[in-house]
Amino acid sequence: MSNLPNELKYSEEHEWVKVEGDKVRIGITDFAQSELGDIVFVELPEVGDEVEADEPFGSVESVKTVSELYAPVSGKVVEVNEELDDNPEYVNESPYEKAWMIVVEPSDASQVEELMSADEYKEMISEE
């Protein structure tokens, strides 16, 4: 079973969200990285870009496929993990720590509340 930290929120598109004050840190779940296989490239937005909930904000490329990343919340990108440019394997090795992808200042904080808990996400992936 995938590693699912309880303090995080989860989206149907397999992104995780960590609330940090008035900002949220976003990455992909352990389940997602294991489904994708070895990650070889990560494409992310620029600081200052706006992201829309349920719309693509970047992509991850694995040896098997290219998969779009979907924003779990709308808002402005205030930080991007540039470490992933040179170390895309962090997504496989440490999806919740080293491989966070972007930090967003949400335009609507209630979107975070609509995301799934770890238990709800676990139930969803067990049905896939």
Curated annotation (Swiss-Prot):
The gene is gcvH. Its cofactor is (R)-lipoate. One of its GO terms (biological process) is glycine decarboxylation via glycine cleavage system. The keyword Lipid metabolism does not apply. Pfam families: GCV_H. SUPFAM superfamilies: Single hybrid motif. The modification N6-lipoyllysine is found at K64. It comes from the Bacteria. The glycine cleavage system is composed of four proteins: P, T, L and H. It comes from Halalkalibacterium halodurans (strain ATCC BAA-125 / DSM 18197 / FERM 7344 / JCM 9153 / C-125) (Bacillus halodurans). Binds 1 lipoyl cofactor covalently. This is Glycine cleavage system H protein. GO terms for cellular component: cytosol; glycine cleavage complex.
